[in-house]
From Swiss-Prot:
Residues the entry annotates as binding ATP: 30-33, 51, 87-91, 415, 496
Oligomeric form and interacting partners: Forms a cylinder of 14 subunits composed of two heptameric rings stacked back-to-back. Interacts with the co-chaperonin GroES.
Residue ranges with Gly residues bias: 537-547
Subcellular location: Cytoplasm
The encoding gene: groEL
Catalytic activity: ATP + H2O + a folded polypeptide = ADP + phosphate + an unfolded polypeptide
Protein name: Chaperonin GroEL
Region (Disordered): 527-547
Species in which this protein is naturally found: Rickettsia rickettsii (strain Sheila Smith)
GO annotations of cellular component type: cytoplasm
Spans traversing the lipid bilayer: none
Length: 547
């Protein structure tokens, strides 16, 4: 077991705060419309350029164990904010540093850390209530675009594309972000149900230019088991041929003789057919096939119910307006399912989401819900270089998460203004002693820091701007760091999701409270062994040589 290094009191906290300062100084430069990029060296490939606070925070690991403990605590505030609200990571970092620094000064001056924490908690809860009261629900596409624009560092195109995607698939719909293979940035909307299984043979392709199989008005056969022999299916295949309509087979797998027979019939033109594997695994596969059955008004042929392929009639097959199958995906458009049955299935999945305690199960259920209740929108992000595409993709993902948060809990005035004005009612809070009052004062001062940092990143004096705004009674009155003007932030479209602002403050206060109430720190003692030489940027596995 490694020997331990033990530090006590203010010395331990001071060293932790040094680590917090190192991380916060790297992250804070990204805040606001005029925040800067950070370049991060990576073990392999080209460096990463980002303006995403949590990406910067996650990349930092300090050599000194005690300083690193502080940095890791601060990193946890940024990470938690990103997980819960999807944005606000830099704000959380700036707030946590300010709260921890001021709190430590007072602990060193003899204040009771537990009472300081109680005072801070009182203040934070009051600010959270103030944020909730001042939040405004967003409904219009324009407001959604504004949130996306601000969260993506003022990129209007990103805001507009996210708003368009949400309009197409609904606020609850599935929106994914992918790298495009060209320079453009597009929204591709897939109407209907899409799942990640492609055709089992390229011979099923009907459009050789796009390499997709397109089936118009097809029948859909859903079979729970593997298909290795078509003999039991002959009656149903003959009925489909007579109807002169295409057939899509979705089964656990189609293999051997069965697949070969389908391919031969497809090539001879006797049967327009395509086969794909069923999506998902195990019980989830069965549930997804039942979803498809309801969506297409078909039946899942399952031996659990005593159903056999040879007894299946054409009435048991589902139907849809169109099915498009690529090498990797299948899209069922306009299934002919009964609307009432689909709504009942949606309600059933929603109740399962409410009951489950597993995050993984919840995510998979939400995917099923989205597939049934809406379409799928794909934001395809392009650019001139790989570095540019990755940087922009990061911003798109941030903006998408922030927009979802805005739809959920509404928006407040942006640019740090809401936190600044929310500090004013805190002076009226009732406390039990002067130490708790000092805890409230810590929060009041810290709430000025995000706005100060935004202004300073824009090249102006943060203290002067804060003073001017506090003189103004209008809570929406703020400083537009992009145009360097004082404006009504809501009217100017400078808005933040209430959930992002709230989460940033709560996570920051949680971490700061841990730091000021820490009295002893135990870390592994540094090893005397010489560390191996680190690889320099270059070819991985080639001794770090640069050519």
């Amino acid at each position: 077991m490694a020997t331990k290094l033990i530090k006590h009191g203010s010395k331990a906290r001071e060293q932790m705060l040094e680590g917090i300062d190192i991380l916060a100084d790297a992250v804070k430069v990204t805040l606001g419309p005029k925040g800067r990029n950070v370049l991060i060296e990576q073990s392999f490939g080209s460096p990463k350029i980002t303006k995403d606070g949590v990406t910067v925070a996650k990349s930092i690991e300090l050599k000194d164990k005690i300083r690193n403990a502080g940095a890791q605590l601060l990193k946890s505030a940024a990470t938690k904010a990103a997980e819960v609200a999807g944005d606000g990571t830099t704000t959380a970092t700036v707030l946590a540093r300010a709260l921890a620094r001021e709190g430590n000064k007072l602990v060193a001056a003899g204040y009771n850390p537990m009472d300081l924490k109680r005072g801070m908690d009182l203040a934070v809860n009051a600010v959270v209530e103030e944020i909730k009261k001042s939040s405004k629900k967003i409904n219009s596409q324009e407001e959604i675009a504004q949130v996306g624009t601000i969260s993506s560092n003022g990129d209007k195109e990103i805001g507009e594309k996210i708003a368009k995607a949400m309009e197409e698939v609904g606020k609850e719909g599935v929106i994914t972000v992918e790298e495009a293979k060209n320079f453009s940035f597009d929204v591709e909307v897939v109407k209907g149900m899409m799942f990640d299984r492609g055709y089992l043979s390229p011979y099923f392709v009907t459009n050789s230019e796009k390499m997709v199989a397109e089936l118009e008005n097809p029948f859909i056969l859903l079979f729970e088991k593997k298909l290795s022999n078509l003999q039991p299916m002959l009656p149903i295949l003959e009925a489909v041929v007579q109807s002169q309509r295409p057939l899509l087979i979705i089964a656990e797998d189609v293999e051997g003789e069965a697949l070969a027979t389908l391919v031969v019939n497809r090539l001879r033109g006797g049967l327009k057919v395509a086969a794909v594997k069923a999506p998902g695994f195990g019980d989830r596969r069965k549930a997804m096939m039942e979803d498809i059955a309801i969506l297409t008004k078909g039946e899942l042929i399952t031996e659990d119910l005593g159903m056999k392929l040879e007894n299946v009639s054409i009435k048991s097959l589902g139907t849809a307006k169109r099915v498009t199958i690529s090498k990797e995906n299948t899209v069922i458009v306009d299934g002919n399912g009964d609307k009432k049955n689909i709504e009942d299935r949606v309600l059933q999945i929603k109740s399962q989401i409410a009951e489950t305690t597993s995050d993984y199960d919840k995510e998979k259920l939400q995917e099923r819900l989205a597939k049934l209740s809406g379409g799928v929108a794909v934001l395809k992000v392009g650019g001139a270089t790989e570095v540019e595409v990755k940087e922009r993709k990061d911003r798109v993902e941030d903006a998408l998460a922030a927009t979802r948060a805005a739809v959920e809990e509404g928006v407040v005035a942006g640019g740090g203004v809401t936190l600044l004005h929310a500090s004013q009612p805190l002076t009226k809070l009732k406390v039990e002693n002067k130490d708790q009052q000092a805890g409230i004062e810590i929060v009041i001062e810290a709430l000025k820091d995000p706005l100060k940092q935004i202004v300073e990143n824009a090249g102006e004096n943060g203290g002067v701007v804060v003073g001017k705004l506090l003189e103004h009674k209008d809570k929406n009155y703020g400083f537009n760091a992009q145009d360097m003007q004082y404006v009504d932030m809501i009217k100017a479209g400078i808005i933040d999701p209430a959930k992002v602002v709230r989460t940033a403050l709560q996570d920051a206060a949680s971490v700061a409270s841990l730091i000021i109430t820490t009295e002893t720190l135990i870390v592994d003692e540094p090893s005397d062994k010489a560390e191996p030489m680190p690889m320099r940027g270059g070819m991985g596995g080639m001794g770090g040589m640069d050519f």
